[in-house]
Amino acid sequence: MNTIINVGRQFGSGGGYVAQAVGKKLGIPVYDNELLCKAAEESGYSKSIFEGGEQRKSLFSMSSFFSSGRLGFGETGYVNDDMLFKIQSEVIRNIAEKGDAIIVGRCADYILRDLDCLDVFVCAPMEYRIQRLVQNEGLDPDEAEALMRRKDRTREAYYNFYTFGAWGKADNYDLCIDSSILGIDGTADCIIDFGRRAGKIR
């Protein structure tokens, strides 16, 4: 049985960094941007067609990205986000079947709901997230707050649309953890300890 950890996160909480820290400590590959590359490669499209997959729900042109005519899309050059979600879901399932993996976002907890995964949601207080964005991205506090709220809204809309669930709601996860309490490394250690105690990290 493979160890699969799905990590959802509030924007600015450092959830992506936490996932990377968990992966480094356990020697497990982390799929975030790498997932986009793999999805694009396996479906015959440029990586850029998957960028922002969690950030939108719309119909858009594929003509500048179309490369192989695979998946039966023909020469129309158009495909909607529902098709892209299906492709992405297949890629995520393939990753989970092939070996241990940590998957960041992308509704992976829902896509892999029939497997014995560890589903984690990383959150943090607004003030902490704003501070991180100011320090790491060079934004002023107002810009950081506006960006944070916008990203969280779009992630929530994307997740709720495809899963019929509630993004960030505790019942959807095995563990919800505030990264501001222990920091990135301490949060990663806590997730690993919890996962081992729960029998989900093997």
Named regions from a protein language model:
Residues 6-23:
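Glycine-rich phosphate-binding P-loop
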Residues 114-151:
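Conserved phosphate-donor/acceptor-positioning beta-strand/loop module used by diverse small-molecule
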Residues 2-4:
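Extreme N-terminal starter segment of soluble prokaryotic enzymes
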Residues 106, 110, 126-127, 139-140, ...:
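Long, contiguous binding/interaction regions
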Residues 40-100:
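ATP-dependent small-molecule kinase phosphotransfer cores
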Residues 29-41:
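Short beta-strand-centered segment that lines the nucleotide-binding/catalytic pocket of NTP-utilizing
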Residues 60-65, 140-185:
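Small-molecule kinase domains that catalyze NTP-dependent phosphoryl transfer to phosphate-bearing small molecules
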